[in-house]
Amino acid sequence: MSLNLTHGVILSYRFLHFPQTLIMMLLKEVVRMNMDDTIFLFLCTLLVWLMTPGLSLFYGGLVQSKNALNTVMQSMAAIVIVTFAWMIIGFSISFDQGNDWLGGLKFLGLNHVGFAISKTISPHIPLALFMLFQMMFCTIAVSILSGSIAEKMRFIPYLIFVGLWVVLIYSPVAHWVWGGGWISKLGAIDYAGGTVVHITSGVSGLILGIMIGVGKKQEKHTPHNLLITLIGGILVWLGWYGFNVGSAFTFDQIAMISFVNTVIACLLYTSDAADE
């Protein structure tokens, strides 16, 4: 095959120069990051994702059969809403430097979020992976919240509420605690989201439940499928290891202690539930 020498040199230069530059940039980032920690957090992120379908099944088995599909889809569809809200603005106002109350807009629409590390946020793992791990936390917080309105709220209004809640409630609280906000400056340490995830979703669920109300015609009923609830509980159990252990962001002594403590806590709870 013959090529015009001039054009061939130019095309060869253009073809080879760009990949080489890109490869060199990637290699520099690989050297800076810790590959063991990156793989570790990647696996933990996948485990935490399992918690959302797990809670969906858990709640779906506890409600009446006529409301099972709506209950399951409330948690699963929320994944889509949370993903859009988090990637567009939630991550930025949570972890970008701003003031004591809100983060800035540097990461708006995932701008400046990629394979590279961040010296202030994720010094040894890709910033994009850190963003995804935190997004899983936001997603599970919404799933926990959905349990308070099972069989009480319509599907579309709930999804609208989720989008607003992520931007107006969860993200600011995440910035207060994890993003250098006023709670962080008090010296507070929130390992694995005791405040950001559980208190925020719990209080929000309580307020939402009170506002909606149980209803006068609400009657007690037995769960329609405890097998589905059991399967969901197992998925949540499995995902909780990634949730707690991954919060160390590195495979070290803290991660192993979290792993052991989570195993013990789950076994003690299971034993207590079996006695009842």
Whereabouts are the PLM-identified features?
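A generic alpha-helix propensity feature with a strong bias for hydrophobic helices
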Residues: L5-I10, L22, S56, H175
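Alpha-helical and His/Cys-centered functional microenvironments
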Residues: L11, T21-M24, A78, G202, ...
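Acidic, glycine-enriched active-site microenvironments
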Residues: C266
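Conserved small/polar residues in nucleotide/adenosyl-binding loops
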Residues: Y269-E276
